[in-house]
Structure formats: C-alpha cells, structure tokens
Amino acid sequence: MNANKQRQYNQLAHELRELQTNLQETTKQLDIMSKQCNENLVGQLGKVHGSWLIGSYIYYMEQMLGKTQ
C-alpha cells in the first residue's frame, strides 16, 4: 500500500473514532433527555387527572345534588 493511501486510511480511522465518541455522547444526552421528559410527563399527567377528578366532583355536587360552594 502506498504512503498516500495509508495516510487516507489513518485519517478515516481517526474520523471514525471521533464519530463513535460523538455518537456515544449523543446517546447519553438523549437518554438523559428521555428520562427528564418521562418524569415531567408523568407529573403533568398526574396533575391533569387530579384536575379532572376535582372538576368532576364539583360538577357532581353542583348538578346532581344541587349544592354550590
């Protein structure tokens, strides 16, 4: 193999190692983002369900039993 071809392969190998490192870091960051989104989403869903429960209780009390607060 000539020197020029060897230099090109060495450069390609270096760039592939750098790409692998960047992909690993990107994967770590995506995992962190996914965990944060899931935690926030679960919290938001809990708030929405709680609001629905309270709203339906108030509606029931006002409409079905004739009570107002």
UniProtKB/Swiss-Prot annotation:
Gene disruption phenotype: Degron-mediated knockdown disrupts oligomerization of the DASH complex and leads to defective sister kinetochore biorientation and mitotic arrest with large buds.
Domain of life, source organism: Eukaryota
Localization (cell): Nucleus; Cytoplasm, Cytoskeleton, Spindle; Chromosome, Centromere, Kinetochore
A GO CC term attached to the entry: DASH complex
GO biological process: attachment of spindle microtubules to kinetochore; cell division; mitotic sister chromatid biorientation; positive regulation of attachment of spindle microtubules to kinetochore; positive regulation of microtubule polymerization; protein transport along microtubule to mitotic spindle pole body
Coiled-coil residues: 1-39
Presence of the UniProt keyword DNA-binding in the record: no
Membrane-spanning parts: none
A Pfam family assignment: DASH_Hsk3
InterPro entries tied to this protein: Hsk3, Hsk3-like
Keywords: Cell cycle, Cell division, Centromere, Chromosome, Chromosome partition, Coiled coil, Cytoplasm, Cytoskeleton, Kinetochore, Microtubule, Mitosis, Nucleus
Record bears the keyword Protein biosynthesis: no
Segment forming the signal sequence: none
PANTHER family referenced in this protein's UniProt entry, alphabetically: DASH COMPLEX SUBUNIT HSK3 (PTHR28289:SF1)
Function of the protein: Component of the DASH complex that connects microtubules with kinetochores and couples microtubule depolymerisation to chromosome movement; it is involved in retrieving kinetochores to the spindle poles before their re-orientation on the spindle in early mitosis and allows microtubule depolymerization to pull chromosomes apart and resist detachment during anaphase.
Family of the protein in this entry: Belongs to the DASH complex HSK3 family.
Subunit structure as annotated in this protein's UniProt entry: Component of the DASH complex consisting of ASK1, DAD1, DAD2, DAD3, DAD4, DAM1, DUO1, HSK3, SPC19 and SPC34, with a stoichiometry of one copy of each subunit per complex. Multiple DASH complexes oligomerize to form a ring that encircles spindle microtubules and organizes the rod-like NDC80 complexes of the outer kinetochore. DASH complex oligomerization strengthens microtubule attachments. On cytoplasmic microtubules, DASH complexes appear to form patches instead of rings.
Protein name in the entry: DASH complex subunit HSK3
Organism (species): Saccharomyces cerevisiae (strain ATCC 204508 / S288c)
